[in-house]
Amino acid sequence: MSEILVLNCGSSSVKFALINPHTSQSLVTGLAENIATKNCKVVFKAEHKIEKYLENGSYKDVFEMLKDFLVENKHLEKIVAIGHRVVHGGQYFSKSVLINADSLEKIKACIALAPLHNPAHIEGIRFCQQIFPELPQVAVFDTAFHQTVPSYIAEYAIPYELTHKHNIRKYGAHGTSHKYVSEQAAKILTQQKANVIVAHLGNGCSITAVVDGKSIDTSMGLTPLDGLVMGTRSGCIDPSIFAYIISDNLGWSVTEITNMLNKQSGLLGICGHNDMREVSQLAAKGDSLAKLAIEIFSHRVAKFVASYMIYFNKLDALVFTGGIGENAANIRKNIISKLANLGFMIDHQKNSNSETFINSKNSHNIMVIATNEELMIAQETQNLI
């Protein structure tokens, strides 16, 4: 029985899963968090949950602990490849690829497009090359699914020479999730290919219009900063705000502004909390800024859904996924309430239960589908080896 090790490496965390790509069974899942701090913890979930602590544990320490776990539990001998989630593949990658010196250099070349993500992915790949040298590795790109977005949507209305010399265009993100969820929606609807709008709402948020199974538009742009309001990211703003802040009036540097827009904005910037569960609790207690954050968040989602309706002669479904999309019934309700004029109506009982279909009888289909990026990465990896 072959197994695929799936890795999602962040700046201070590593999420991992061991998956049988043929049966879709998840054999082991786990998370290492707070890497390189005194609170570094690694959690393994298989038949039992195991927690281990690595005070000031490094990335390398985490990978060595992971290898020890795989050896002790007789998994390493069954692993045939490692699949890595990579947020940004730029113009270089329209599909998943085997990792070699050339592809790794191209991933490095995309660091400026995903400065919060790609450096950590590269570090994870390098440690795997050291610790699992015999295993082939595959990069599965969040941007690949969006390579079908037509040029009149992907291009920005700035000087053409500039955009093409420096590969400035809409690349999107969360493509692995959008692809998986749109395919699952098609299966549930018993269609070969579906026409759906997928709203991936979590700490990072994006919306994609999928026509005949292909991405035709998506809310994230050159980088994962564009589009919806997110946990700590601003989403789309007037570009002149950047120039205003950097002016002599305020004197911020480009680095400071970029950090602010990526790490100090969104829900966190509005009300001081980036977790929608905490924001919702505060709003329920009457906190005015938490209420404002929810309204701004919900309005932005509804606005994108409304704008994407132009792509469909017949919409098969609006699909919610991601941590917020799958679990926050109050947020789904708030979003749908703003779309009543377009034929979206919610069944409050079904919504409260997070059923697969949460729409009322005379509405467009509204669905809740759990994403499974790890399984999609495992299957893409299996197909390449």
From Swiss-Prot:
The record marks H174, R233 as: Transition state stabilizer. GO terms for biological process: acetate metabolic process; acetyl-CoA biosynthetic process. Transmembrane segments: none annotated. The keyword ATP-binding applies. Pathway: Metabolic intermediate biosynthesis; acetyl-CoA biosynthesis; acetyl-CoA from acetate: step 1/2. Its cofactor is Mg(2+); Mn(2+). Mg(2+) binds at N8, E373. CDD domains: ASKHA_NBD_AcK_PK (cd24010). It catalyses: acetate + ATP = acetyl phosphate + ADP. Substrate binds at R85. ATP binds at K15, H200, L201, G202, N203, G204, D275, M276, R277, G323, I324, G325, E326, N327. GO terms for cellular component: cytoplasm. Belongs to the acetokinase family. Catalyzes the formation of acetyl phosphate from acetate and ATP. Can also catalyze the reverse reaction. This is Acetate kinase. It comes from Francisella tularensis subsp. holarctica (strain OSU18).
